[in-house]
Amino acid sequence: MTNEMKIGKLVLRAALALGLITINVELSAGNAGENQSSVREIVAADRIKASGLDAVYDFDAVSPAARPKGYKPFYISHYGRHGSRYAYARETYTDLLEMLQKAEQEDNITEYGKSLSLRLADFYEKVRYRVGDLTDKGWNQQKRMAGKMHSDYPRAFGKGSNVRACASGSIRSIMSMTSFCTELSRIAPKTEIIAHQGLEYIQATSPNLGTNPFRFKGPKFDFPYAESDEEFLRSFFPEYVDVLGRMFKDPSKAIEGKSHLWTMDYMYMLVGGMNSLDDDVRNDFSDIFTSEEYVKMWEVDNYLRFCEYYWYRTSCSAIFVDMLDKAEKVIASGGSGADLRFGHDHCLMTLLMIADLDHFGHFPETPEELSQYYQTYRSPMAGNLQFIFYRSRRKGAEPLVRVLLNGQDAALGDLAHSESIYYAWSDLRDYLRSRIAMFL
């Protein structure tokens, strides 16, 4: 059953079938394809970027609003990640804590490990019932995003405009949509805003889910690298044992029977996840890794996510199909407004591969070189991909489209711009159709 929220001038009526919502009412990556040392220098110089998927949206690193001469913005097609959240996996908060507590019982813990265990236990009491929830920071990110979209492109939200929003079934995505639409309804009272959540919209929000009955099927692909993510940890960052050695007298005993990769990645997400938490909850666990170790762990996690998201290119093509179809209808109708989709990093990252955005879909010879092109920090909390459509008064003139990733201009592979930073709509449409066809 489809769930809807219809937003009037300043009224939000929520009727979500899940029955779980009561409303009480912070990346720029440089250019993809940079040389290896350049990417690693960027990450080493910026602890937020080194947090990968736990980076937060940087509102200060966006390109100024612009428009081609003789054109006016009339429509925005958007796919956005939910705002900042608590860890999506409980193990982020419990895995290391349980290891430390067990080690203390077995006299296998260092003094540093004892101190860390106490800090973690205290922190866990604050977050144990909040796993996966949107934080206040995440709510405010989406609110601010709505304000910026309206201030940059006010003509898209004038009288007679329509905004259609949909979200995945995740509560953090639904709450992100709610925050965005609530603010937009306040500042754009002439715009009709309809928000949806339901299985009918899964192809536009989270089509890679195994529960998706409409999931696209496509050709089988070979993975480009022989090395598994677990093997990559051991070959690329063998010093991870030093991290464990500061906590445990015998690290091999402490980690026996566990995935070394996930043990380290839960620690990495614990540290980076502090970026998203509110001040009264946040704790500082940055001492778990040295700066050099944290950068290494970014690259390990970067490869881990690639190993997962590579396989979503077929299913996530549904999002681009939805974007193209809805844009065609708006253009044909002469209407204005926006289509907003609220989902997850695994979809946003996959869209970048499908479109080869800034050559994100280029896979070099070895996994050690992958970070030249593929960087998780390009999908921060509240990260988003936007197509901004511009219409000319000249009869027969084709719409132009500006492509923005996290508020910065981005390039679609080697597709030529028709004017400055803008693509002709037919060129962009045909390019994306050709890319989608590769995976279907």
Model-derived segments and spans:
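Signature for phosphate-centric chemistry
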Residues: 30-164, 168-339, 343-440
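Bacterial Sec-dependent N-terminal signal peptides
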Residues: 1-34
